[in-house]
Design a protein with these regions (language model features):
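Short, small-residue-biased leader/transition segments that mark boundaries at the very start
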Residues: 1-6
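A basic- and aromatic-enriched beta-loop-alpha substructure that forms the phosphate/nucleotide-
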Residues: 7-28
Length: 107
């Protein structure tokens, strides 16, 4: 896997994962652009992280709001990032979307 942060003892700690986009990029390229395999592995690692009794903060990028790239690899990665963001947000207690430094509470 592209990361093994979940193997660390995180109980009782505040942990910032910055940045989810780079984290996803590592899995995407380790898996040679296979979005399905990358997403499965990212979800597995996320689930292992959230099993610990830690306060987790995930910082990510919303890269799907712009135009659609003509490049197939970029489109696949944009999809992967969107699916990963949705997965994390669905399991988060709180989601804040930052726009120009202004927090907008989503959840």
């Amino acid at each position: 896997a592209a990361s093994d942060v979940y193997k660390r003892q995180l109980n009782g700690r505040v942990v910032v994962i910055d940045c989810v986009t780079l984290w996803g990029t590592n899995f995407f390229f380790d898996n040679e652009g296979d979005t399905n395999r990358s997403l499965v592995e990212l979800k597995e690692e996320f689930n292992k992280l959230t099993e610990q009794d830690a306060y987790l903060i995930f910082v990510t990028n919303e890269i799907g709001l712009g135009g659609v790239s003509p490049d197939a690899v970029q489109r696949r990665f944009t999809d992967l990032q969107g699916w990963l963001n949705q997965y994390i947000a669905s399991r988060a207690d709180e989601v804040v979307f930052m726009v120009s430094g202004i927090p907008m509470k989503v959840k």
